[in-house]
Regions:
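Extended hydrophobic/aromatic segments used for targeting, binding, or gating
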Residues: 32-35, 53, 205-206, 210-216
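A non-catalytic, amphipathic alpha-helix used as a structural packing/dimerization or gating element
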Residues: 32-35, 260, 264
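C-terminal helical subdomain
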Residues: 161, 185, 207-248, 253-259, ...
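Intracellular terminal tails of multi-pass secondary transporters
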Residues: 259, 266-273
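Rossmann-fold NAD(P)H-dependent dehydrogenase/reductase core
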Residues: 1-194, 270-272
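Short, well-ordered loop/turn and helix-capping segments at boundaries between secondary-structure elements
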Residues: 125, 201, 230-233
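A glycine/serine/threonine-rich, flexible loop-to-helix segment
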Residues: 143-145, 192-210
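A short, mixed-charge helix-start or loop-turn motif at secondary-structure junctions
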Residues: 2, 150, 154, 206-210, ...
Length: 273
């Protein structure tokens, strides 16, 4: 469970722990990870939780995380790609990628691929990726994915990263056909979390103005929990909202863009053969 120290991720991790799952909680701050693990153990009888730390702004750290997970756990039944970020000003990751593309798409793309063999060996298994309805305003400019030649628009860049989540899920599901591993993604709703805290003044204002109509993290986690654990989920490659499969924006059904994004992502993350 990535990005599980607060908000939707924490609520999802706690719900799954209360259902009896062994939950591995990821965060970028060791103190926060430890605190959440202790709090979940206190709130959930016989909860089996532990933590791992990695910075998704560094692909080297993502690779280290994948090795640590594989070393510590013989089985991996569910991978929830929840970690995400928003920023209103352009800045690079440690690898030089646009911040939101790097953390919201390339990091989970790499982590998922590095853990695929463990997931296949644990089949039936599930991959759940948190996207957003914001993908509807996203445009993937393959000639300028890092926003080096355009005026930066943080919300559009966020939307592009969430569109990438859906395209990634679609191609991943196709590649996993017959493996016993499913891949689905979701819109959690507009949730009252701290995701806008690192988005600059403009982003924080957007978050504050929208907070009155936002869902609680527990409510926002419902679709993630459903896709991770419900026996009713028997599909793959779908986009969910409120625990139901729905049609994403037309751009999310672009087969050529789906294939191209996969190829580009393989190259950028060093997975290309």
């Amino acid at each position: 469970m990535t990005g599980a120290t607060r908000g939707i991720g924490r609520a999802t991790a706690e719900a799954l722990a209360k259902m009896g799952a062994t939950v591995l909680i990821h965060g970028r701050d060791s103190a926060a990870v430890g605190a959440v693990c202790r709090e979940i153990v206190r709130s959930a009888v016989r909860a089996n939780v532990s933590g791992v730390v990695a910075d998704f702004a560094s692909l080297a750290d993502v690779r280290r995380l994948a090795r640590e997970i594989a070393d510590r756990h013989g089985r991996l039944d569910v991978l929830v790609n929840n970690a995400g970020t928003v920023t209103m000003r352009r800045k690079p990751t440690a690898d030089g990628f646009e911040w939101q593309l790097g953390i919201n798409h390339l990091a989970p793309f790499l982590l998922t691929n590095l853990l695929l063999e463990r997931l296949k060996a644990s089949a039936p298994a599930r991959i759940v990726t948190v996207s957003s309805r914001a993908h509807r305003r996203g445009v993937l400019d393959f000639d300028d994915l890092n926003w080096e030649h355009r005026k930066y628009d943080g919300l559009q860049a966020y939307g592009a990263s969430k569109l990438a989540n859906i395209l990634f899920t679609s191609e991943l599901a196709r590649r996993l056909t017959g493996s016993g591993v499913t891949a689905n993604c979701l819109h959690p709703g507009v949730v009252a979390t701290n995701i806008f805290n690192h988005a600059g003044l403009a982003g924080r204002l957007v978050g504050l103005l929208a907070r009155w109509r936002m869902l609680s993290p527990v409510k926002g986690a419902e679709t993630s929990v459903f896709l991770a654990a419900s026996p009713e989920v028997n599909v793959s490659g779908k986009y969910f909202d409120k625990c139901e499969a729905v049609e994403p924006a037309p751009a999310a059904n672009d087969a050529a863009a789906t294939r191209h994004l996969w190829e580009v992502s393989e190259r950028l993350t060093g997975l290309a053969k």
